[in-house]
Amino acid sequence: MLAELSHRELIKLAQKRCIPPLLPKFHKGQSGGRVCIIGGCEDYTGAPYFSANATALMGCDLTHVICEYNAGTVIKSYTPNLMVHPYLRMSNTKLDVDMDEQRKKINSLLDRIHVVVIGPGLGRDPLMLKSIKDIIRYILEKHEGKIPLVIDADGLFLVTQDSEVKEMLKSYPKGRVILTPNVVEFKRLCDAIGKKGDSHSEMGSLIAQELNCIVVEKGQSDKIFSPDSEKDMLTNSEEGSNKRVGGQGDTLTGAISCMLAFSRAMYDFKICEQEEKGESSNDKPLKNWVDYAMLSCYAGCTITRECSRLGFKAKGRAMQTTDLNDRVGEVFAKLFG
């Protein structure tokens, strides 16, 4: 059981079981995976960038961003390393555009993606939220929910407000949906499921079990709740920073999504044998996808916390999101080689 392992043991296990090796035989997208961040609107362009940039710096082979039309050029200007698709529209968009055609473009891209992040910089425009609902439905119906979803920010707002979305998430395979609420969003989720627990941990487990998902509650310690049992909860108390910057949660979604893409390469696609990672056949594998996903979330939390610690050490109160986000690559290398 993962909850019985120490921090060092969990990180070592993630390195051995979740992260595929880089081998000459692998083609582009096979080892590092393909991740898509869905978010970004006229008012919020930084959040999807920080999530996508963290994913890319983690080693993702191909990182896409699907955003609202007005956010596209801005996000593209930040870096040439991301593929940015301005396919979403807000309700007040005056462009003459065929939304069915835009939906086809989105679905065509999703068919090639291994992990989807929903929410960074999304906003709460009704047409944007409807597009997200359509995406959640499409992945469930076309791909049987096998493409993991990492849902944050206004994606969580949609979950709390739309009962049909909640029902769809319940139909995804266990552990294929990861929710990453902060303390306020966690309370909203508690209210949305209409259940009460005797303790904070029990409430986290109730949310995870009710929605058939993994819940990563961000806080002084990050708590990762399993859809299986309260006993399976993981707690990450590694040192971070005393300053919280906007965008730290976006860095976390990027780190988690890339770890999930790595885990899919190992668990779903089985791209290499144990011997290719230098492992013994006597090594016990993780039991199932939920174990891989829980461990991926733990690793993502560790990376984000260490980036935050280093950023704060270097800049103190002046630390900005870029000061931690740009450290993702070096921290990943330090932890996992």
Curated annotation (Swiss-Prot):
Reactions that this protein is recorded to catalyse: (6S)-NADHX + ATP = ADP + phosphate + NADH + H(+); (6S)-NADPHX + ATP = ADP + phosphate + NADPH + H(+)
Entry keywords, A to Z: ATP-binding, Cytoplasm, Lyase, NAD, NADP, Nucleotide-binding, Phosphoprotein
Location, primary (coarse class): cytoplasm
Essential cofactor(s): Mg(2+)
Superkingdom of origin: Eukaryota
Alphabetized Gene3D superfamilies for the sequence: 3.40.1190.20
List of residues that carry Phosphoserine: 6
GO cellular component, one term: cytoplasm
Binding-site residues, ATP: 218-222, 240-249
Coiled-coil regions, chain positions: none
Binding positions for (6S)-NADPHX per the UniProt entry: 121, 182-188, 250
Subcellular locations according to the entry: Cytoplasm
Catalytic class of the enzyme: lyase
Limits of the YjeF C-terminal domain: 11-335
Any one GO BP annotation for this protein: nicotinamide nucleotide metabolic process
Gene Ontology MF annotations: ATP binding; ATP-dependent NAD(P)H-hydrate dehydratase activity
CDD domains in UniProt: YXKO-related
Xref: InterPro entries: Carbohydrate_kinase_pred_CS (IPR017953), CARKD (IPR000631), Ribokinase-like (IPR029056)
PANTHER family to which the protein is assigned, alphabetical: ATP-DEPENDENT (S)-NAD(P)H-HYDRATE DEHYDRATASE, ATP-DEPENDENT (S)-NAD(P)H-HYDRATE DEHYDRATASE FAMILY MEMBER
Other remarks on this protein: Present with 3870 molecules/cell in log phase SD medium.
Physiological role: Catalyzes the dehydration of the S-form of NAD(P)HX at the expense of ATP, which is converted to ADP. Together with NAD(P)HX epimerase, which catalyzes the epimerization of the S- and R-forms, the enzyme allows the repair of both epimers of NAD(P)HX, a damaged form of NAD(P)H that is a result of enzymatic or heat-dependent hydration.
Family: Belongs to the NnrD/CARKD family.
Protein name, entry field: ATP-dependent (S)-NAD(P)H-hydrate dehydratase
Source organism of this protein record: Saccharomyces cerevisiae (strain ATCC 204508 / S288c) (Baker's yeast)
Taxonomic lineage of the native organism: Eukaryota, Fungi, Dikarya, Ascomycota, Saccharomycotina
